[in-house]
A protein has these predicted regions:
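Compact, glycine-rich, soluble single-domain proteins
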Residues: 4-97
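Acidic/glycine-rich phosphate/pyrophosphate-binding loops and surrounding catalytic core
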Residues: 82-130
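N-terminal export/targeting signal detector
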Residues: 1-4, 129
Length: 130
């Protein structure tokens, strides 16, 4: 028996696939899901979505959102999903430098800078793991 995983962004259903296990980045740590997992809902953070089928592992970057697990269906609603191959370390390092140089003269600017820095650092961590 496998899990059916559905990943949805505001624009589209990004993909649907079956997997033996799914690991998601919750806002407070990672969570692994296997078949017959208890029903749950969680808030996603930025990080690596890992799908394992047989001996094959597939990784994607997700940016926030929610996960629901019910009856061996894993539904992931996220702001953004991208394959690990879509990222380039040199570009991410430039993006991080640019983000750290963003102005922080107001609460709104600080919040925006923190959001961008967190996303880029999560993307770099994902590349370091692969």
């Amino acid at each position: 028996m496998t899990l059916h995983c559905i990943v949805v962004t505001p624009e589209e259903t990004a993909f649907e696939t079956d997997a033996d296990s799914v690991i998601v980045p919750l806002f407070d740590g990672e969570k692994g899901v296997m078949t017959d997992h208890a029903p749950m809902i969680g808030r996603l953070g930025n990080g690596t979505l890992t799908l394992t089928t047989g001996g094959t592992t597939e990784s994607h970057y997700v940016e926030g959102g929610f996960i629901q697990v019910l009856d061996n269906v894993v539904s992931i609603l996220t702001n953004r999903v991208a394959a690990i191959e879509d990222f380039n370390r040199d570009d991410l390092e430039v993006n991080l430098r640019d983000a750290l140089a963003m102005p922080g003269n107001s609460v709104e600017q600080l919040d925006q800078r923190e959001k961008v820095v967190d996303a880029v650092r999560s993307q770099l961590r994902m590349l370091n793991r692969s």
